[in-house]
Amino acid sequence: MRREEAIRAVVAGDHPDPFSFLGPHEEAGRRVVRTFLPGAARVRVLSAAGRPLGELERVHPEGFFSGPLSGNGRYRLRVLWEGGGEDELEDPYRFPPVLSDYDLYLFGEGNNHRIYRHLGAHPAEMDGVCGTAFAVWAPNARRVSVVGDFNLWDGRRHPMRNRNGVWEIFLPGVGPGALYKYEIKDAGGSLLPLKADPYGFFAEQYPGTASIVWDLSRHRWEDGEWMERRGSRNAPDAPMAIYEVHLGSWRRRPDGSHLTYRELAEELVPYVAGLGYTHVELLPPMEHPFGGSWGYQPVGLFAPTSRFGPPEDFKHLVDAFHRAGVGVIADWVPAHFPEDAHGLARFDGTHLYEHADPRKGRHPDWGTLIYNYGRNEVRNFLISNALFWLDEYHIDGLRVDAVASMLYLDYSRKEGEWVPNEHGGNENLEAIAFLRRMNEVVYGEAPGAFTVAEESTAWPMVSRPTYMGGLGFGYKWNMGWMHDTLQYMKEDPVHRRYHHDRITFGLLYAFNENFILPLSHDEVVHGKGSLLGRMPGDRWQRFANLRAYYGFMYGHPGKQLLFMGGEFAQEREWDSGSQLDWHLLEGGENRGVRDLVADLNALYRATPALHQVDFEPEGFEWVEGGDAEQSVVSFLRRARNPEDFVLVVSNFTPVVRHGYRVGVPASGPYAEVLNTDDPRYGGSGVANGELEAEEVPWHGRPFSLRLTLPPLATVFLRPRPV
């Protein structure tokens, strides 16, 4: 390209390789510097020490300057602007590349697992100059520029260097707090809508959509003890009672505005810890423009939402949970992304992150786009994001949303709306390979962290290691258990005898996976009402049913999860636009449910038989699972030491069962350690107190207890040490 053509191309924002022309270069045997500064009247060159080295000639009226540069050292530009005022600027085009060749090679392979340390916007120092290093992947773009509040959002000012499809530039003087986006020209030369940074660490509050340069090192962590021991606390034999939270609607200020991350650290953390929960699960904390998506349509996967404060304040919240002994799980959405113009959709003018074929690239239910898991750089983006939350924010676990939609090519699609895989089947082989690799990387590179699958089908071995042929998750939500048992609880007690299999069926497959029992947010939205509202009977019976159900759940094999509000029997459907109905705690019935949940958590955590062998048949034993006529179930839970056991009995009718005999394996005294019918919880007070096992064989066991079963209640009994 001739010199005049190159100048015109720079001024028009069309130069294919701006670093080959702008900045310092050899020309006709001498060293020259070229710069494009729209609005500049004069430009002088200074040495690093401030000594004048000469003045550049204005060679284009739009602000292109060129001139000789004496010496080979550093230089700065002194700019006199047309409107008055003067600045001393570093020239971005004198600095070397941002990424190494090796980083680019690994990224192209899909194996640069922490590429977030290189792509995006990183405050940095180069050649003694402070600024920000920008890098973005857009392989099909003709030109990419950084635009922001530091350059009047003018894409001609800072076009980037293209290296293997990654565009990069170091901008001196740009630091934390600067707003920015990428201006991209597609292969045909058309300007696309300004794009937020896919790897951006912080973003404007909606309706603003710009990314914000941010320094993630501002928080000083104080959770070292937790991080050292978290592997044992997140292990399959540890208690795991999870409180699921939507941060925006847990509690609000009197004026209806959101609590900040720091306010949540002061209020939410002690609340969760005080109830005895071991973990909190946050609905997706990533940046999302549409609040009504609850975070499940994220645009900024690397940015905690700015609704509640800056990134360091989110770190403060996680830190506070850890110091209170509570682990943090984040919902994570690698299944799809929204079509917002500033997001990933057609990022460089092509279907870059998504499949071009809508039969593979568009989700018919949600109107969102599906990641192209077969592309190395897209897999790298997602795997790097998973590690980012575990590394940078000390997140303990990732609950992967909508896994079923990833596994099946025909998920929610009719005949002719999907494309079979290479073997003619409906399995999404690329998504399966991605999930397996993601889990291998998480478990291999983030010690003590874990993953959870929200997977609603019968796909086998979801929570089994990849070397065994599994998907590699640590845990899986037991959606079948949740649907069956809730359906059972909705039945009038007089009819439950005809649906007894719904309450027992889960034990047929309880040990096929490492299950979490989820009473999640999905069960209190979209017209389903509250958990309490789905219980039959009058008000007293509804509360009693709910208490009995919670007791049964805590006795059942599997880890525990309850969505916020369930702990005090929220009476209306969850509304993400307001806070929970905290005034209900003024009533004894709701307060009683909260006290029951706290006591269930305490019992669960203190009793190895209730959590130590959740995922093996040795941890569970039916005593009587077939008493459909009386709607009673009874079973034993055992610890690693089989002599350490708990007897759980649930009566799902409002009839007091006097003299109900239950077989037990050991003689001696037994104590009722928890009864959901306790008056402290709002119950009627039918109790057993101290019991002595009788030498009356029952249920195939040498001894038995003669119980009084309270109405609509679950009781826990265990041998009392003599």
UniProtKB/Swiss-Prot annotation:
Entry keyword Lipoprotein: no
Residue stretches in coiled coil: none
Any single GO BP term: glycogen biosynthetic process
GO molecular-function term, one example from the UniProt record: 1,4-alpha-glucan branching enzyme activity
Keyword hit for Transferase: yes
Enzyme kind, highest EC tier: transferase
Enzyme Commission code(s) on record: 2.4.1.18
InterPro entries from the UniProt entry: A-amylase/branching_C, Branching_enzy, GlgB, GlgB_N, GlgB_N_E_set_prok, Glyco_hydro_13_cat_dom, Glyco_hydro_13_N, Glyco_hydro_b
Pathway as given in its UniProt record: Glycan biosynthesis; glycogen biosynthesis
Keywords, comma-separated and alphabetical: Carbohydrate metabolism, Glycogen biosynthesis, Glycogen metabolism, Glycosyltransferase, Transferase
Catalytic reactions on record: Transfers a segment of a (1->4)-alpha-D-glucan chain to a primary hydroxy group in a similar glucan chain
GO CC, alphabetical: cytosol
Catalytic residue list: 401, 454
SMART domains: Aamy
Quaternary context: Monomer.
Matching NCBIfam families: branching_enzym, PRK05402.1, PRK12313.1
Annotated family: Belongs to the glycosyl hydrolase 13 family. GlgB subfamily.
Its job: Catalyzes the formation of the alpha-1,6-glucosidic linkages in glycogen by scission of a 1,4-alpha-linked oligosaccharide from growing alpha-1,4-glucan chains and the subsequent attachment of the oligosaccharide to the alpha-1,6 position.
Protein name: 1,4-alpha-glucan branching enzyme GlgB
Species the sequence originates in: Rubrobacter xylanophilus (strain DSM 9941 / JCM 11954 / NBRC 16129 / PRD-1)
